[in-house]
Amino acid sequence: MYTPPRWNNKALKWFDERLPVLTVAHKELVVYPAPRNLNYFWNFGSLAGIAMIIMIATGIFLAMSYTAHVDHAFDSVERIMRDVNYGWLMRYMHANGASMFFIVVYVHMFRGLYYGSYKPPREVLWWLGLVILLLMMATAFMGYVLPWGQMSFWGATVITNLFSAIPVVGDDIVTLLWGGFSVDNPTLNRFFSLHYLFPMLLFAVVFLHMWALHVKKSNNPLGIDAKGPFDTIPFHPYYTVKDAFGLGIFLMVFCFFVFFAPNFFGEPDNYIPANPMVTPTHIVPEWYFLPFYAILRAVPDKLGGVLAMFGAILILFVLPWLDTSKVRSATFRPVFKGFFWVFLADCLLLGYLGAMPAEEPYVTITQLATIYYFLHFLVITPLVGWFEKPKPLPVSISSPVTTQA
């Protein structure tokens, strides 16, 4: 039974009686009952929130000095780097913040896959997380176009052209995206407007994601629900301190890239102004799109490649029903655990192959890796759930500790 806080400050008490945001914050962020056995992989959810805030804040400052015009966009970015006070810092924080954002979100997702956080009753929580990923991808792609370098221009041309593979309406969709018959100033204006809008949508979906989390509570490494107060501890101070430690490590890694390797994740060709008459030797997207780009190229047919690429993400929406096992955590599923690590290696291999040229032997290896990606979800996961014999589950979250004691 939750007991509202007693406010010693009369002003706070007066305000909270009329708009109880402080009481809600106290309930959901201070005394919120979290499983007592969460490991450091559960830090990545809060780190994703921090990364999102960094991206929104730096993006707002960059937008103040950016010019969304094909004749001035590249120069405006260079002016931000040279003439705007701390503009170089804002740009490098924003560019590297995108990579950090995707890193923590991908770790967050693979943690969910390993510990079965997509299983009932958290299906909607999982769906909202996938919507967040899709919004991140759309936002990142449009942001990559804004500097209007060679990779920006040709990346926009290649990716938007994929929609032409859609029967009947494909060409009309491409024309709508371009605002004309080629990637030009209307395209840049559209992408800048949407790049500014999508983070607000992202923030709203993150709020729903957290709401769903607090309704059905957190999963945990054992994959079993809390049986009572002995299985939980207050979020503050235990997990706020733990999250603060993780944040310190995250910021050290983030600052290393911002100050010592700001272009580590970037493409040298994007420091060349966009030129529609000169095609780069090797067009590649940002690293966080590479696995899906590899899947796109694995299928010779254009429409088939597009369907495979989008299917690689959309298949995750039905994963709660593809996994037939009653046990959530891979800790107690030895066979599934082995296949999980093979799947992780397959995803890393696809990322590597996505950066390689479309030639042998990379094409054949990419096709095999793509086949395994879909086999993992459509064949291996259901079959393992049916035939695997899991290890015995603990009686409660606290029982492994109390039994040893």
Curated annotation (Swiss-Prot):
Cofactor binding mode and count: Binds 2 heme b groups non-covalently.
Name of encoding gene: petB
Species of provenance: Rhodospirillum rubrum
PROSITE patterns to which the protein is assigned, alphabetical: CYTB_CTER (PS51003), CYTB_NTER (PS51002)
Description of how the protein assembles with itself and partners: The main subunits of complex b-c1 are: cytochrome b, cytochrome c1 and the Rieske protein.
Compartments, as annotated in UniProt: Cell membrane
InterPro entries per UniProt: Cyt_b/b6_C (IPR005798), Cyt_b/b6_C_sf (IPR036150), Cyt_b/b6_N (IPR005797), Cytb/b6-like_sf (IPR027387), Cytochrome_b (IPR030689), Cytochrome_b_C_euk/bac (IPR048260), Cytochrome_b_N_euk/bac (IPR048259), Di-haem_cyt_TM (IPR016174)
GO molecular function annotation: metal ion binding; ubiquinol-cytochrome-c reductase activity
Entry-linked Pfam families: Cytochrom_B_C, Cytochrome_B
Protein's membrane topology: Multi-pass membrane protein
Protein name: Cytochrome b
One of the record's GO cellular component terms: plasma membrane
